[in-house]
């Protein structure tokens, strides 16, 4: 493959911006960019001349990004095979701006070797220049906006990355931001919270949104597309991101196209600093690349048993979900968990959590009524080696009982929609008011609630007059507020109401909630919680940025990151690194299977939601355990201590959970057995033969009567693979992966010898990526450390570098 010439943007008309660009052109002379090749040899691309018809190639792992002379992406090439993965007939600039509410596209692009910078420029109409610094990393490349130059009077509102139109959609990891087939994977990852991994609701026409399949996995909980880098389309897939400028007051559209006023934030909230990573990879190396990106770019990197949570078996571990967990019974609950081989107790407490109210998240009496009381509960469970988790409702602010955020006087930082002034005075007893604008009462926000000063007022009818809007059917003094008179001209704001009919915290409150959730981990010792209802942080108008601010802010407030499980109601690209898993419940097993297809596509652990075992037969409980073994999926076993303490079958239930979960976590079931367990028409029972080592698996009918002969289930003897690693080529990107035959592996370590200089070994995934600098034979020993009582595995490998 050869590089076509690259334009230097010559021939633009004279002007201030043109002179700036020409001054910069002196350090943009011809430069060789190396497109990292396959093991058979590196491919090099050279800028040969400066014509407008040129093409620039930029390596990003095994992906070669081809830009034409205008800065449009015209090639997405697997540099190993030469195959172009761009969707035929589709291309957009890598970077575009929205200036003065008009889409502005570059007319040229230039590379500067002095600072590794791509300059996207346009001197016609809305003149601008965007500098993007490109850095080659280990298997990926980063792209960061370092400068935006335009007319000082212009309003740079949004920066758009792509979308990159990809021709394949065999597997689309929406939240992970990865599109792949059996041969190649292409990924885009936002590298900070301000770079939102999604597409702005305001510009569907610029991002092929009409072609997007909103819910390709048929998730019942919701479509994940509004918060996702990757989206499946009718012709392939797109990878996209954007950054909104919040240095000025903005309006952002919610899911119902309602405009929500936001900001302004500080001067750092411009589009400068928007940053993404791009990469192409063999499919089996994607988790290794994502691990290197997270660790190399200072993204959240939670671990389970010291292993990155995205590849840790412990991320999919089961728990006991006990509706009546409290300080009096936690000791017995922990002993039950021990008997079942379960490490986590979880308090859902009416699907809200053990709180006096949501918002400030102070513990209620079930957890001792204070942080100190809750800490004692946690310590009691810890004596049995069991950790405690709690349910939260993210930035839902409860109004019954009222949280201090809504108690008079209500916090001014509650999330609000549009505003308009009173056009007439309002008395404290009136059931009608008049507005000088329509925005506060237009459709598009849950419920019909207004805020005037510190009073919350609901309404049920709106009628347009000649110069004002009549709002009637008022119910005064809602949410514990006090009816009050208000003068003409007083602002009236629409209140953004959550799906539980309470308030939602705005950005300042979101930050405080994140700090509070950090405290319950650091001080109290809580090690597991769910961000239920987290879409509310997006409904504030802040979109993915709002969700990331809460979830990643909570992570930042933690003083330790090992062994903490976080679940979510929405899996988003910007919070993917922090979140351990989703665990969506449903009574329909087909839906749970579909959920797990989504989890697998996004490198998330298998989960089967909460499963209420109260009063169920042992056969029905084992049937769900069999499905969990088939999918390698954890389960939230929901019940009450009242039931477990009174039921005669409790010891048998606990033992069955222990046997199935132990065998699952060791990888004891064969692929053939897992396929049989997946069949929803079947029921099974599992009995221990040698504790922790072997079991007898028996198919049964609905009454528990055996069908056919029993099968042997055995813990695997740990082994490493493959037997031989591929040959490497000096100066060319190399990728390989050491694997084990058990999910119980928690660490890969080079215990003797060493890799070729330039290669990096990932201890969490077993992946090897890099560009070897020297020829020769390099021999080393890899040791896999295993959990669950399994022996460690060792193998000696040699990499030949030619």
Residues of each region from the PLM?
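Autoprocessing Asn-cyclization modules and mimics
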Residues: 394-483
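Strand-loop-strand motifs at the edges of beta-sheets in extracellular beta-sandwich domains
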Residues: 757-773, 781
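C-terminal edge beta-strand
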Residues: 789-802
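Active-site-proximal substrate-binding groove within the catalytic cores of carbohydrate-active enzymes
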Residues: 547-715
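Carbohydrate-recognition beta-sandwich/jelly-roll modules
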Residues: 57-349, 380, 387-388, 527-528, ...
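Solvent-exposed loop segments of extracellular immunoglobulin-like
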Residues: 743-750
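Aromatic-lined carbohydrate-binding/catalytic grooves of carbohydrate-active enzymes
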Residues: 308-309, 313-417, 496-518, 524-541, ...
């Amino acid at each position: 493959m050869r590089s076509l010439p690259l334009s230097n943007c010559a021939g633009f008309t004279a002007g201030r911006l043109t002179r700036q660009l020409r001054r910069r052109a002196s350090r943009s002379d011809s430069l060789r960019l190396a497109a990292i090749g396959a093991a058979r040899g590196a491919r090099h691309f050279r800028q040969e001349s400066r014509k407008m018809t040129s093409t620039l190639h930029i390596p990003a792992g095994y992906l070669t990004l081809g830009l034409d002379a205008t800065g449009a992406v015209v090639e997405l090439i697997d540099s190993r095979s030469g195959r172009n993965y761009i969707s035929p007939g589709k291309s957009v600039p890598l970077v575009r701006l929205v200036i003065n509410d008009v889409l502005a596209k570059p007319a040229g692009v230039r590379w500067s070797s002095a600072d590794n910078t791509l300059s996207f420029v346009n001197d016609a109409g809305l003149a601008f220049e965007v500098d993007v610094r490109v850095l080659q990393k280990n298997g990926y490349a980063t792209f960061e906006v370092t400068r935006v130059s335009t007319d000082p009077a212009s309003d740079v509102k949004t920066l758009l990355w792509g979308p990159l139109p990809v021709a394949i959609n065999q597997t689309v990891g929406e939240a992970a931001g990865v599109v792949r087939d059996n041969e190649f994977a292409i990924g885009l990852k936002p590298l900070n919270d301000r770079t939102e991994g999604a597409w702005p609701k305001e510009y569907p026409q610029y991002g092929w949104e009409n072609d997007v399949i909103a819910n390709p996995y048929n998730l019942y909980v919701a479509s994940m597309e509004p918060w996702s880098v990757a989206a499946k389309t009718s012709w392939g897939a797109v990878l996209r991101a954007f950054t909104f400028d919040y240095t000025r007051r903005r309006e952002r559209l919610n899911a119902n196209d309602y405009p929500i006023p936001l900001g302004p934030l500080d001067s750092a909230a411009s589009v400068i600093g928007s940053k993404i990573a791009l990469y192409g990879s063999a499919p089996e190396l994607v988790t290794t690349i994502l691990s290197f990106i997270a660790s190399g770019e200072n993204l959240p990197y939670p671990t389970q048993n010291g292993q990155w949570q995205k590849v840790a078996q412990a991320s999919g571990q089961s728990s006991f979900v006990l509706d009546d967990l409290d300080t009096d019974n936690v000791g017995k609950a922990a002993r039950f968990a021990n008997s079942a081989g379960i490490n986590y107790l979880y308090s859902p407490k009416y699907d809200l959590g053990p709180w006096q109210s949501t918002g400030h998240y102070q513990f209620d009496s079930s957890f001792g009524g204070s942080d100190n009381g809750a800490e004692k509960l946690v310590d009691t469970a810890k004596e049995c080696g069991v950790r405690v988790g709690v349910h939260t409702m993210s930035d839902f602010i409860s109004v019954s009982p009222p949280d201090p955020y809504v108690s008079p006087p209500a916090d001014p930082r509650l999330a609000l929609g549009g505003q308009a002034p009173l056009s007439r005075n309002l008395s404290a007893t009136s059931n009608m008011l008049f507005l000088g604008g329509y925005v506060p009462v237009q459709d598009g926000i849950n419920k019909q609630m207004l805020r005037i000063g510190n009073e919350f007022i609901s309404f049920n009818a709106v009628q347009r007059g000649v110069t004002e809007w009549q709002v009637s059917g008022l119910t005064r003094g809602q949410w514990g507020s006090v009816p009050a008179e208000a003068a003409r001209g007083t602002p009236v704001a629409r209140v953004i109401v959550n799906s539980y009919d309470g308030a939602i915290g705005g950005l300042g409150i979101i930050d405080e909630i994140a700090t509070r959730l950090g405290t319950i981990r650091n001080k109290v010792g809580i090690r597991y919680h769910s961000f239920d209802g987290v879409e509310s942080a997006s409904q504030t108008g802040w979109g993915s940025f709002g969700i990331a601010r809460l979830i990643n802010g909570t992570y930042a407030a933690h003083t330790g990151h090992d062994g903490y499980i976080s679940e979510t109601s929405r899996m988003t690209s910007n919070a993917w690194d922090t979140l351990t898993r989703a665990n969506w419940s449903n009574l329909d097993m087909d839906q749970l299977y579909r959920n797990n297809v989504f989890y697998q596509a996004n490198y998330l652990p298998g989960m089967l939601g909460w499963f209420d075992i109260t009063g169920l037969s042992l056969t029905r409980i084992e049937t769900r355990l069999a499905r969990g073994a088939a999918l390698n999926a954890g389960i939230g076993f929901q019940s009450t201590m009242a039931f477990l303490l009174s039921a005669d079958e409790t010891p048998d239930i606990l033992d069955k959970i222990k046997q199935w979960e132990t065998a699952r976590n060791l990888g004891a079931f064969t692929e053939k057995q897992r396929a049989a367990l997946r069949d929803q028409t079947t029921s099974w029972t599992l009995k221990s033969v040698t504790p922790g080592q072997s079991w007898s698996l028996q198919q049964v009918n609905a009454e528990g009567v055996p069908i056919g002969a029993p099968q042997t289930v055995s813990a695997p003897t740990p082994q490493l693979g493959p037997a031989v690693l591929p040959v490497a080529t000096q100066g060319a990107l190399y990728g390989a992966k050491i694997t084990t035959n058990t999910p119980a592996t928690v660490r890969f370590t080079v215990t003797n010898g060493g890799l070729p200089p330039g290669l990096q070994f990932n201890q969490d995934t077993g992946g090897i990526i890099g560009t070897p600098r020297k020829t020769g034979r390099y021999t080393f020993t890899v040791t896999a450390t295993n959990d669950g009582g399994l022996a460690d595995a060792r193998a000696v490998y040699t990499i030949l570098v030619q």
